[in-house]
Amino acid sequence: MPINIPDGLPAKRILQQERIFALEEDVARKQQIRPLRVALLNLMPTKIETETQILRLISKSPIQVSVDFMRVSSHEATHAADHLVKFYDTFDDLRSNNYDGLIITGAPVEQMPFESVDYWDELCRIMDWAQEHVLSTMFLCWGAFAGLYHLHGIHKRLLGSKLFGVFPQRLCDEYNFLTNGFDEVHNMPHSRHAAPDEKEIDADPALQVLSRGETSGPALIATRDFHEIYALGHFEYGRDTLADEYWRDFHAGLPIQLPLNYFPDDDPEKQPIFTWRSHANLLYRNWLNYVYQTTPYDLERVPEVVAELREHTEQLLAKGGVPSKF
C-alpha cells in the first residue's frame, strides 16, 4: 500500500530502502482516488522506531494511506522532542478531522494505575472523540489495556513476572474477517507486565476474543463491528526489537530474563528467527481492507456510518446474534 507521509520523515528513507512505496507528497495529491486517512497516536518514547514499524505494516496493500501523526500535549517528551515538533500535531490540532482509522500505541507505563499517568485525561478525551470520529481504532499493548479499561471497564492485573518473548496463539474463530488467512496457531511477541481480566472480557457481549494463548491469554480482541481492535502483543515488532529490549535492560543492570521462544538455543548472541511477520502483515492488511470496504467516500459521513454500524450491532446482539457481514 503506498503511504503518503511527510517528506523528510526519517521513516520514509528507511522504508524506501526496503522497497516499500512511500509516495512523494506532490505525486499523492495527483492520484484520482481518496486515500484512507489514518492517524497514529504514538505514545512510545522510541518515536522513530515505533512509527517506522507501524508504517511498514500499513504499507502492504494497494490503497494509498495518508497518515497524520498525533501526540499528547499534556506530557513533556524527553525523547525525540525535535522530531515531535516537526512531524506531530496535538489532538487539539486534529480533533476537527474525521478518520478512517486510528492507531494508539503502547507506552511503558503499564505498572502504574491508569489515573496516575500524566496524560490519562487527555487520552480519555481522544478515545471518546474516536468513538464518533474514527471508523476503526487499533489499540496496541498498553494502549489496548487503556482502551479496554476506559471503554469497557475491563481491569488489568499485574503479573508476577514480565511476559516476555514470542508465544503461540490459537484462533478462536477461523472465519473471522480480521484474522482471515491466519494459521490456526500463530506466533505473537509480548513484552508486558500486566494482563486483562479474562472473565470481564468474556462477560462483555460487545467483545469477541479472536486469538488467545495458554501463556499469554487473550491476544487479539475486537468489538463485534470492528470499531475497536485490541492487540495485547506486539505484531508490529521487528526481528530484533525484543533483543534490543533485553540488551538495554541487561546493560542497565536491571533484572531481565531471556525472552522465551525467541533466541535460537536461548543464545542471545544468535540472530532471532522472525516467526510472526506474515501474520502481522495479514492483520494490518485485513484491518485496512475492512476499513476500505466500510468507510464512506465522504469523510464527513464517518460519524453517521459509525452510528449505523453500532446500532446494527446492538440490535443483533439484543436478538442473540452477531453481525452477519463480519
What does each model-found stretch correspond to?
Residues 1-71, 88-94, 98, 166-326:
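Amide-donor transfer/coupling interface in amidating biosynthetic enzymes
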Residues 50, 79, 113-114, 148-150, ...:
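Short glycine-/acidic-enriched loop or helix-start segments at secondary-structure transitions
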Residues 53-55, 84, 116-119, 152-155, ...:
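Short, glycine/charged-enriched secondary-structure capping and boundary segments
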Residues 73-86:
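N-terminal beta-loop-helix "entrance" segment that forms/cooperates
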Residues 85, 105-108, 267-268:
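Short glycine/proline-rich turn/loop motifs
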Residues 104-173:
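Cysteine-nucleophile active-site neighborhood
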